[in-house]
Amino acid sequence: VSNAFWSDLSAAVFGKAVPSYSVQGSGHLPSFYKVSDFAEASVGLAGVALARFWDGGADQVLVDRRLASLWFYMTLWADGWKASGLWDAIAGDYQCRDGWIRLHTNAPHHRDVALLVLGTKADRAAVAKAVLTWRGVELESAVVAAGGCGAQMRLPHDWAEHPQGRAIAAEPLVHWDDHGVCAPTAAPEGPSLRGLKVLDLTRVLAGPVATRFLAGFGADVLRIDPPFWNEPSVEMEVTLSKCCAGLDLRIETDLEHLKQLMREADVFVHGYRADALDRLGIGTEVRRELNPTLVDVRLNAYGWSGPWVNRRGFDSLVQMSCGIAGLGMELSGSDRPKPLPVQALDHGAGYLVAACILEALSARRKGRLKSAKVSLARVAHLLMANRCEWDTSGAIKQIPSDFNATVENTGWGPAHRVKSPLQINGVTPH
């Protein structure tokens, strides 16, 4: 296929551009960026990485462009019940004295911080009134300093001149660390990831997309959350085919339990801020001592260098920071920020993380140890290099035939899932 993203993605993961996948389906998600091209290439990347792990090649990989675009959104069609809303009542974009800012308040402790900084009650109108009294950069700094999540809307040229924007532009798409050798491991048995133990310390949305992909092909994924964390609006998306448990890593016994899980795992994927595990006493060197052959892949929001390396962030905030939402507003003539039609940074980064995990596992089979780091902001940098015109002809929207006919009995009620966008030699996720 001809895809603007393939050479960059494949070179970042495999060290060189490799033959591409096959594609079927058509259409696109209307945007000022090539979002559907990115969705197709991201799913294809993970598929090719899995085919290589199974000693196959890209010629075995078939991606459905339409379905890949739909898998960049919510994939479940509730039958007779209604899923929770995606956003907290306070979360969203607000006008400030000199532009716009986005507050991310889905987590109760992040909402509490925003309200404390603003000195107002949990009422959207009151929050909007309070935000209007602030300059954007000052409110962003105050919320972040207090432990919350917010992002001032910038334009691409603002981000290019910002210290963090410059740092991101200088980073590779994937930070690889070739850190040792080991005894070669056995080849997998057949087209499956059965028996692969994946320890998942990630939250909405990129990391869970990566581990959902692995779980779909049979990996044993154990997701660990702190007791205070809750994702009711996306649980049916991010816990598919996984086991879930809770640990409070501030408690010594729970931390020791996590260490034991690390010793037993094949893969550890985590999305905490860059310094979080170091502060818990389980930094990179400690993890390698616990399990020398552990495949360790990390994800964060704002990259691995620069002044924002430890900043909290989510897809919607990165879109505001780097200029995606601002440029969308400018080009569309909208009176408010216009982000991507889907959280493409999260989903694209998720499939990139999955591909990195599989490539590191392929290296381990040959006796080489590799770890990787990925960020939403660097994924955004790639996407922003691939602009397009807004076009609603051929726009992709969910229709009943996009969903599996088989009922999926979830913990919330019966539902239908969007069909798989990927086949590898005829094998699809289950």
Model-derived features: positions:
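Short, well-ordered alpha-helix to beta-strand connector turns
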Residues: 218, 241-242, 265, 314
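Glycine-rich phosphate-binding loop and adjoining beta1-alpha1-beta2 segment
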Residues: 219, 223-249, 257
